[in-house]
Amino acid sequence: MTTALDQLKQYTTVVADTGDFQQLAQYKPQDATTNPSLILKAVQKDDYKPLLEKTVKAHASKPVGAIIDQLLIAFGTEILKIIPGRVSTEVDARLSFDTEGSIAKGRELIALYKEHGIGRERVLIKLASTWEGIRAAEVLQKEGIHCNMTLLFSLAQAAACAEAGAQLISPFVGRIYDWYKKNAGSAWDEAKDGGANDPGVKSVRRIYAYYKKFGYKTEVMGASFRTPGQILELAGCDLLTISPDLLQKLHESTEKVERKLSPDIAKESDIERVPVDESSFRFLVNDEAMATEKLAEGIRAFAADAIKLEKLIDALR
């Protein structure tokens, strides 16, 4: 029997969401995504301590931020030896409200990859989908530096990213699901509120329809999944980035996978254009409690993990 993972690959580009590159080869993903939390998790494993120690030793005289950049590039370089496509490398979350700082960091990361013989076409620079992050992406994209817009929880963010010409967006499914489930409390009914009615699934479906209806070239990559069911509800999305645990579950399953999203159906959507000027963007994101809370929470969490990584590196110097 064909696995659910192989069936999914007929409709969607499968991406591995991990810093643990030793797990990659068995699932044959096209691309891979990383973030500060995933890199922190990886370097705490014995398998990756030699890479961490080698990187810190080679750049010990540099500021800790520069060593983190070198570590991100080291992981990205190893990942690109395994996958045929692109790796996503994230800009420090503490720059989420700093357009110029984000632009500078994006350029630095691409320059470091170039020093390792890796062209910009194989790298996506991950930026938070704040107003400032989106403006940074607009500049970087015009320079030929492709951007992956992360921490995306609303149609307003997605619309602004598309207008800015971002290469790709990563709308978060699981974190949206978490918020609605937590806020519903005892009223949550998984049978009724999950599956096709899952708030995270519905959010990505809506964004996908918006992009296809209005002809945007920006790629939609569903992210942050909790279950195989959430993934399969989005079969047909441009890309889906999936953790190794869930890739394994899909690999073990022979469940029949049907295409749920397609450009032709999406183009028939009655969805309307969203204003993307700064005041409208800020109001619309603020008006959606889930998006506001999860964006802020996500930035705090990624920033906290960057600080933990700094302390880990300082302890090795």
Curated annotation (Swiss-Prot):
Pathway where it operates: Carbohydrate degradation; pentose phosphate pathway; D-glyceraldehyde 3-phosphate and beta-D-fructose 6-phosphate from D-ribose 5-phosphate and D-xylulose 5-phosphate (non-oxidative stage): step 2/3
Entry GO CC: cytoplasm
Listed GO MF terms: transaldolase activity
Enzyme class: transferase
CDD domains: Transaldolase_TalAB
Database matches in InterPro entries: Aldolase_TIM (IPR013785), TAL/FSA (IPR001585), Transaldolase_1 (IPR004730), Transaldolase_AS (IPR018225)
Chemical reaction(s) catalysed: D-sedoheptulose 7-phosphate + D-glyceraldehyde 3-phosphate = D-erythrose 4-phosphate + beta-D-fructose 6-phosphate
EC number: 2.2.1.2
Active site: 126 (schiff-base intermediate with substrate)
Keyword Signal applies: no
Localization per Swiss-Prot or TrEMBL: Cytoplasm
Example GO biological process: pentose-phosphate shunt, non-oxidative branch
Key words of the record: Cytoplasm, Pentose shunt, Schiff base, Transferase
Function: Transaldolase is important for the balance of metabolites in the pentose-phosphate pathway.
Family: Belongs to the transaldolase family. Type 1 subfamily.
Subunit structure, interactors included: Homodimer.
Protein name as annotated: Transaldolase
Lineage of producing organism: Bacteria, Pseudomonadati, Pseudomonadota, Betaproteobacteria, Burkholderiales
